Amino acid sequence: MKRLALWSMMLVLLLASNGWGRQESLTAEEKQKLEKIDRVLVEVIALSDKGPADPAPFIEVVTKRMKEFGYTVVTDPAQPHDVTFNIKCEQHKIWEGTTKMGSDADLPDSPSRLWKGPACQLSYVLESKKMPWRKEVRTDFVDAQQAAEAAKAGDPSDYAMSKLKERLEDYDFPALITAEWGQEERLFKVYDDPATSSARKVRLIGLFGYLFETKAVPRLLEGLKSNDIEIAKASALALGNIGQKDTVPMLIEAMKNGQPELRPSAAKALGVLGALHGDFTIVDPLLETLKTTDDVNLKIEVAWALGKLPDRKAQEPLVALQRSLYHVRENDADPKLVKLKEAVNWSIKQIDTWEYLQ
């Protein structure tokens, strides 16, 4: 049992997201204040190569989008507010971060030291304390002059500012900041709104998993049965991240009989859940699926899952599969087979290591 507990603890450490670790650094008092935020002061700085630019278009976008989640937005610092949401948009971005890598710096929408083109940096201040949450949106070009000429768009500074405004209209920062503040009820309200797009629902489901939000489980179980395959897949992965053991039977059913595109995601979630709880009941369904499916994508996720909860009974089937993949090389024409071989080799090593520890 001690070895199993150690293995599960190692898995939890591997699964813990950067956002989770940062949230754990907040004090209990700070978390309580974040959860009660309603009045948001929006402050925007816009800088082009010509000097200060008009912040009004950015303020309009941010105000409109924050209201989607029910926040009361103010723009006058003299008015009562719970938090200050800062947006700095520049034609040539000036770096304001402190680290090149690690923590949130490794996330795709975090501020980049290397990017010198048009960008908007997003952050917030709680009671005069600048919080570590940082996000950044960038244009798809670095040189606004060249981009404006290619688009025949006139002034490059105006073009850069207009494109940054478009990025803020597309980027779902209101959902991200709401998750950061731990206000799941606002997330649920938007998710439950019939007018919410499928793409946004998928992003929200990902945030439910990020928050390890157990209150989201009923919605995710419904999502698992959705005809919208992207919602179903995202729901499966979020259930794995949240880690409620009583969702294992539903995920097994989804892996065995769900839509073909859903089954790999369900297998992946089972690997996480099984290892988290030391639940070896998932091994037989995984092995049965490995034996009966011809779907390489599903085989890949099943193989990875079997390695996350090493069981001796999985070794023989995995070794047999490994032998059938001896001919596969790293530069093989079929990248799926390369991934399958990698997953099988890794899982066999985990089983061997587990046996050694015992």
Language-model-detected regions and their locations in the chain:
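C-terminal/domain-edge helix-coil "capping" segments
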Residues: W20-K33, V125, K129-R203, L211
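A structural "domain/chain start" motif
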Residues: W20-K64, P174-I177, K189, R203-G206, ...
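Short acidic low-complexity segments
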Residues: F69-D82
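Surface-exposed short loop/turn segments
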Residues: T84-R134, D352
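Amphipathic alpha-helical scaffolding segments comprising HEAT/armadillo-like alpha-solenoid repeats
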Residues: A175-D192, E213-K225, Q244-K256, L276-K291, ...
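Conserved hydrophobic register position within alpha-solenoid helical repeats
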Residues: K201-L204, S235, A266, V302, ...
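Alpha-solenoid repeat junctions
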Residues: F208-F212, L239, G243, L270-G278, ...
